[in-house]
Amino acid sequence: GLFGTISYSSMDERFTASLGLRADANNYSSAMKSLSDQLSPRISLSYQLAEHWFVSGNAGLYYQLPPYTALGFKDNNGTYVNKYNLRYMKVSQESLGISWRKGDTFEVSVEGFYKDYDKIPLSVVDGIPLTCKGNDYGVIGNELLTSTAQGRSYGAEILVKWLIAKKLNLASSFTIFKSEYRNDKESEYIASAWDNRYIFNLRGTYNLPYQWSVGMKVSCIGGAPYTPYDEEKSSLVSAWDAQGKAYYDYSKYNKERLPAFAQVDLRIDKTFYLKHCMLGFYLDLQNITASKLKQQDVLMSTGIIENPEAPADSQHYKMKRLKQSSGTLLPTLGITFEY
């Protein structure tokens, strides 16, 4: 690969620009060996409109290899079955923002962004873009794939920073977005596994007298979409015995959504400045509200056949659901030492 960049700043430093160009290639297949097919230009601009006011924007084209598990997948004959199906994944992104700054003590900014994804690997078996397979799938990519899926994500972010020297350090951000994928150009967009819709973060530290300080972090994220199980198919004895786990109902892919999750962390520090060193003690309380992050229930077979008198291909297991959630108060006591 090759990479180059050039930067410019005006004499009064009100305008800055950066240009870059990257090219990638490899010898995995004939479709990936040409540098000219994976040229990635990018540009970043910033301009001071007036006192305290700044506008900035950037645009770029990026290429990335599919997962190595996909590139290295072989069939029973030892053939790299994805060799002629996969291409570099292509991502183009643009953003534009405006900010108001008062020195280094206060800043408010608003930024909008748009990302377009192309040549994303698609699972031939499941008919799902590889990037949409969430944490439930374990290792992904070791299957037959084709680079036909597309995606997009877009949204806006508000960022606030406030600093009072030796007293307060506060930062907050709120992002709203949508993340969608489709199998090909003719398909409709559907929510990706990461389409949480919003993320909120607030963190701050306040310095008290006598070298005490208190910090807090508040995090909140919208619920992720998920695909419900096909209970009828999953309960079939022949189907369950074939793979030992439930089947998803892909006709309702990512149509359901989990609850939102919020967490509050608290930290208290006490510092002692000695002659040649600094000694500190802290109490860190993560998730002080003991909030629970809920996941999709697991559909399991009880091993009991509900209709043993039925023909073998029509017998069904009695099923049960196991709740999945995590989250507990996690206290930590610590010591810091600097010499």
Feature map (PLM): residue ranges:
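Gram-negative outer-membrane beta-barrel transporters
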Residues: 9-11, 15-17, 114-116, 135-228
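Extracytoplasmic loops and strand-loop junctions of Gram-negative outer membrane beta-barrel proteins
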Residues: 23-28, 75-83, 91-92, 137-145, ...
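Surface-exposed extracellular loop regions of Gram-negative outer-membrane beta-barrel proteins
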Residues: 52-94, 114-139, 143, 217-243, ...
